[in-house]
Amino acid sequence: NLVATDQMIDTPTNNFCTWNPIDIFAANLAGVVSEGNLKIVDSINHIAYRATFGLSSGKWYWEIYMITIGQAANCRTGICKTNTWGTSSGTGPIDMGVAWTYDADGQKTIPGSTGAYGATYAAGDIVGVALDMDAGTITFYKNNATQGEMASGITYEVAPLVCEGNGGAQFDSIANFGQDSSFAGAKTAQGNGGDGED
């Protein structure tokens, strides 16, 4: 019973990932997702969101615009392994040792350790993430200034991540995975030719 009007040609050539509202890391780690699944408001709760693309090869870049950072030591952005979830309610990717993050207090978190890394960041800052899965390295930027290579030897499939590990602190952000460099109108579009930008 199919006719021509029941069919739709799909030729995906310019796809962008978003935050995945159903791929929260564990129970009680959900916030409120809006703006085409690019904005996350954590509602003063623990959050851990992965993006919809798993990355195992190639070079990738995305940016996170910081809206609210309640407690710098617990607000993080970076990557974590795909196909891993918390073993209990509230168990996040940092607890599981499956994340590489640049923390708002300037520290880094990598599987098995933490330490000093770069400048602190706050509300109004943009954190860029440059991931080279061919070389297995990740480098972060604060407002276009490199913070240096943070880690190497990354051989797992990973996905972009934002997480906040203090139930009493707010962490709200908007992502740009290439589709909207205005961060839902929070900034002036950078004119990169993304859909809805110019």
Task: Name each region found by the language model.
Residues 1-198:
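PRY/SPRY (B30.2) beta-sandwich protein-interaction domains
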